[in-house]
Each structure stands twice: as C-alpha cells, then as structure tokens.
C-alpha cells in the first residue's frame, strides 16, 4: 500500500549492508501493518457491494482469508449468506487448513498447507459490570464433547482443558504479582466454534471485561498488555 514520501524524516525505511557478515540485502517492497480492507461485500438486504474502508486488522477473519487466497469452502460455510457465522467458523477452519498435513493435524484425504501449528487460542474480552472497583477478570472456555472427544492425532480433547487451565493460571499469577490482585474466573466446557473446530488443543480466552472500569484500566495499560501477552 503506497504512502506519500517526504512527510517526515522519521517516517522512512533505510536498508544498509553494513554488517560483520557477508551477504546481500534486498527489498522488493516494504509493508507497514496489514493494509486496508479490500474485500467488497453487500450489507444485509442490499445488493450493492462495497469495501469497509477500515484497516484490515479491524475486519473479520472471513475477509482476511478471502484476501489471502484461502479456498472458498474454508471461509464460507453459509453459502455467502451469513458473514457473521462465516467469520466465527473461518477461524477454526482456517487454522485446520493451515495445519492439515503436519504432524499435529495428519490427514490423507483433505488438502492442507502442512504448517505445524500446535495450539489455537481465540483472544476475546467479556461483558460484565461492577458498581465498585472490583475486577471481573479472566475466563477460559474449551470444548471436549465433539468429534469423538478426540483431536486429529487421537489425543483426548481434555488436552484443551489443560491448555486453558495453564493459561488462566499464568495470567493470574503474573497480573497478581504486578497489580497485587487479579481475578481468576471459571473454566467452562462449552460448545463454541473457536474452541470446538480446531483439531489441536484450543481455547477461548476472555481476558477481561470491556464493560467494567477496573478491568479497562488494565486493558489500557501497555505494561499490563505485555504481561498478558507474555503469559
């Protein structure tokens, strides 16, 4: 995506071959971020298709996979009639498509990209409100009661519970160490696409409540974001 030159001396990219090692430095293009959305879709009840006008990171997974060249059958499971449902399902299906053919998602009947992806996590924020400065905190969701309770390798889907439990424990430990207090909420075995469809251990992480003031103080703290991401 092109941008205008000469706006700022700091807004530039420099390539140099000054190094203690022999070799070559080349760059056909330089990209900042994911670019702008360019997938045309019609809103419900309309025939006219248009692009969102938003950066791609603010769009859904369905549109990213479309742009990235993922097969239509992976990102569209509702015949193009329900982008909301497609977006939810595309996350797990897209992950399986990338990993299929690797040691973690072995499959001889469906094509895949063979990328060795070991885990899948859907990072969310939850709703919920307190009338004081209490923290609502972090919740984990996993799914065990589908696909014969097994993952692609034959491993029990209880591995997803272990994954979710470890994730919540680490976030709780690290944020409590930094803040002095953090709330670890429940682990739920529930039927959600993002925790059901991936054929590797997977979970949905509800990091905090986007509706609660005390949680959002943490959400807007760059160091807390780092702690959560590291955990």
Predicted regions and their residues:
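Second-shell loop/turn segments in exported
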Residues: 20, 44-52, 77-85, 147-158, ...
């Amino acid at each position: 995506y092109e941008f205008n030159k000469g706006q700022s001396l700091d807004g530039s990219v420099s390539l140099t071959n000054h190094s203690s090692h022999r070799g070559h430095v080349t760059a056909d293009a330089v990209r900042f971020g994911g670019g702008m959305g360019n997938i045309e879709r019609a809103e419900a009840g309309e025939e006219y298709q248009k692009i969102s006008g938003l950066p791609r990171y603010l769009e859904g997974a369905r549109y990213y996979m479309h742009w990235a060249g993922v097969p239509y059958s992976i990102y569209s499971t509702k015949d193009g009639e329900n982008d909301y449902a497609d977006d939810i399902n595309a996350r797990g299906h897209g992950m399986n498509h990338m990993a299929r053919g690797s040691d973690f998602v072995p499959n001889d009947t469906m094509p895949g990209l063979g990328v060795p992806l070991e885990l899948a996590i859907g990072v969310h924020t939850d709703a919920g409100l307190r009338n004081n400065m209490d923290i609502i905190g972090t919740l984990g969701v996993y799914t065990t009661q589908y696909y014969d309770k097994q993952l692609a390798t034959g491993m029990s889907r209880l591995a997803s519970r272990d994954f979710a439990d470890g994730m919540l424990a680490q976030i709780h430990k690290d944020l409590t160490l930094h803040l002095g207090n953090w709330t670890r909420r429940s682990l739920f075995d529930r039927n959600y696409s993002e925790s059901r469809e991936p054929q590797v251990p997977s979970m949905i992480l509800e990091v905090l409540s986007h509706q609660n003031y005390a949680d959002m103080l943490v959400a807007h703290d760059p160091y807390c974001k780092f702690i959560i991401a590291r955990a």
